[in-house]
A protein has these predicted regions:
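Extracytoplasmic/secreted cell-surface and envelope-processing proteins
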Residues: 38-42, 63-65, 105-107
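Acidic catalytic loop of the alpha/beta-hydrolase fold
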Residues: 60-65, 70-72, 103
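Alpha/beta-hydrolase-fold catalytic nucleophile elbow
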Residues: 31-34, 56-57, 99
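C-terminal catalytic histidine-bearing segment of alpha/beta-hydrolase fold enzymes
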Residues: 87-161
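Gram-negative outer-membrane beta-barrel domains
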Residues: 62, 78-85, 89-94
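Extracytoplasmic/secreted proteins, especially bacterial periplasmic and envelope-associated proteins
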Residues: 2-6, 26, 77-81, 112, ...
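Short beta-strand/loop motif that positions the catalytic acidic residue
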Residues: 49, 54-57, 61
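Primarily recognizes the serine-hydrolase "nucleophile elbow" in alpha/beta-hydrolase
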Residues: 1-49
């Protein structure tokens, strides 16, 4: 998920790394499961002409920031941050936000949300609809989990000894 988002962001902003792509190259759409952007130069921004995005993310993800985690302009910017940026820039997206769900959304949508993924491809990619949709989902039987993490906690989760 990070690779797909990062590639589209680099292409959208005309970064040097993206210049290996043909000049008229454009991703038809991006499906991101618990992904984020990595930036060493402050807050990343998409333009309104970025590819439409389907963003899945759980609010209790301690592996990849749901919103953002940064120190001195270096950080990861997750699905909530990306959706807010695309809203400001009139970019097309569908943001599936799952309350109290952790990093399991890095894989489960590919099995459990096939209908939603196919509908996104039909509506946003094939038919070219320019929509901004946010679905906030909560399993009322699921236990509440932490939803705020420090940079140190993200590092500890990802780099256990």
């Amino acid at each position: 998920a990070i690779t797909a988002l990062q590639a589209e962001w680099l292409r959208d902003k005309g970064a040097e790394l993206a210049k290996v792509l043909p000049e008229d190259f454009r991703y038809a759409g991006v499906v991101s499961c618990a992904g984020a952007l990595f930036s060493t130069k402050g807050k990343p921004k998409f333009s309104g002409s970025a590819a439409p995005m389907l963003l899945f993310h759980g609010t209790s993800d301690s592996n990849v920031p749901y919103n953002k985690a940064s120190v001195m302009g270096i950080g990861f910017y997750g699905s909530k941050y990306i959706a807010k940026n695309l809203t400001k820039e009139d970019g097309a997206y569908y943001f599936y936000s799952a309350e109290y769900v952790d990093h399991e959304l890095a894989g489960t949508p590919l099995f459990e949300q096939c209908d939603l993924i196919m509908q996104f491809i039909t509506d946003y990619v094939l038919e070219g609809e320019r929509l901004q949709t946010t679905a906030e989902v909560r399993d009322i039987n699921a236990p509440r989990k932490p939803t705020r993490f420090t940079v140190k906690e993200y590092l500890a989760t990802n780099y256990k000894r």
